[in-house]
Amino acid sequence: MTIRSLFPAVALIALVPLTVNAQSVVKVTPLGGQEGEFCRFDRAMIFEDPNGTRILYDAGRTVAGAEDPRLGKIDVVLVSHMHGDHLGDRHNPAPNAGSCDKPDISASALPNSNSVNIAVKTGAKIVTGSEMPSFLANKLKQAGGDEKNSVLVRFGAMQTIGGVGITTVPAAHSNGISGEFVGQRLGDLLKETGITAYAGPATGYVVKFSNGLAVYLSGDTGITAEQKEVVGEYYKPQLAVMNIGDTFTTGPREAAHVINKLVKPKAV
């Protein structure tokens, strides 16, 4: 099964125009490893609200560190879960390093993470759910940032930052913190025993922008009941960003079911 099999199922959805305030739009910019390409290791996106608030979603490994010239002003950093390909254990040394198939991720961000380093450099708030905020607050402090910039938003309510509403929604995925991020003796013990530290459940997000656009960011997940009851029927997002990875996340057919039957956005 290839990702191509998803496209016929959702192509019609993607052609439907979004109904938002015509005087203002949300700008969406992918920050992939290769300019002009969409590669399988790419995660990061910047969402810019009409009022100028800029949100970085899952910096991962393709944002070339805190000095990446594509970042610009960042007000909020979202991290769906603690795995290295989303939090950012290492990253490209520069944009376009390596290739789509073999990205150069030789620059280490450990033990702080790419996301934390970017938040410290830009002064952004890191907005997460579950048990992640306390861990990230400590990481911010260790990296020379303000621990108060780690903001909690658990399932059930929204935080409003810079005029943009942000909430977390359930995702069916593991969320252990690897020993590499923990560091010191405890980190070594975790690596030696092959286990990870507890961070609570993984999350997705619903982000509501000042022009009324609601966006569902699935994070890594499988099919969940909440995609219908919470995301689709309560938040009613017009745009969805759906992670597809088959064994590790929803497969192409499963993702098509989530989009067409549960969330029902107007664009994907």
Predicted regions span which residues?
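Structural motif
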Residues: 52-55, 76, 164, 213-215, ...
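Bacterial N-terminal signal peptides
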Residues: 8-17
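Sec/Tat signal peptide C-region and signal peptidase I cleavage site
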Residues: 18-22
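Metallo-beta-lactamase
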Residues: 23-27, 31, 118-253
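Pre-active-site segment of Zn-dependent metallo-hydrolases
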Residues: 33-116, 144, 175-197, 221-235
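A short helix->loop->beta-strand "cap" motif at the edges of active sites that frequently abuts
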Residues: 53, 121-125, 263-267
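Charged helix-capping and loop-helix junction motifs
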Residues: 111, 252-259
